[in-house]
Amino acid sequence: RGSSFCIRRFKDDPFSPADIIAFRTMSSLMVSYLWIAFQNEVPMLFVGGTASGKTTTLNAMCIFIPWQMKIVSIESTREVNIPQPNWVPGLTRQGFGGESTEGVIGEFELLKAALRERPEYIIVGEIRGAEAYVLFQAMATGHCAYSTVHADSVPSLVHRLENKPIDIPRVLLPALEACSIQIQTRINGKRVRRTKQLVEIVGIDPNSLEVITNEVFRWDVTVSYTHLTLPTNSNV
């Protein structure tokens, strides 16, 4: 059938937190929670399937990063677009033709270089492989980092992070302090995006070595909105 290509169009003005509330992807209470988290440098992952709105939500919430902070973003395809003046965007580069790897600059190399720039916030478009280990090491040493990853729940997120090609040791997982689980679904025949859960990573059980989580928000399907739930600890 020949070659094909995909065009992903973006708004001239990126979606704002107010848009996320208007779309009912999140409630105003959840956005307020993330406002506090972003301003207080809480490392977080935005988790979901393809086209669930992970990067859109991450980009919208970045407006809450204090404007005087230095931000470095790293992507293979340019999607992050934030207004802060002290933002340094980084983009991966392919090799100089053919099968040669000469000249290739990947997310792993960009992330290592970014850590030498003394960033206060690091944004990685998506973690897929070796760059995730460097990102978690950065979190563990006090850097605030945000990224997206393909998974549909906290257990599947832990499974993806611990296994190849990402391969993060379980002892590093508590460096991640929270995650937002997003889904794409249909309501009355209309395709919508919803934040299914917002979960805090509490730590690791010293006896079972299971990851202890605290679910703060959960989407209530019956009212098509995100409601606050009572704190509930569980092991993953």
Regions inferred by a protein language model and the residue ranges of each:
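Phosphate-binding/switch region of NTP-binding enzymes
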Residues: V171-P206
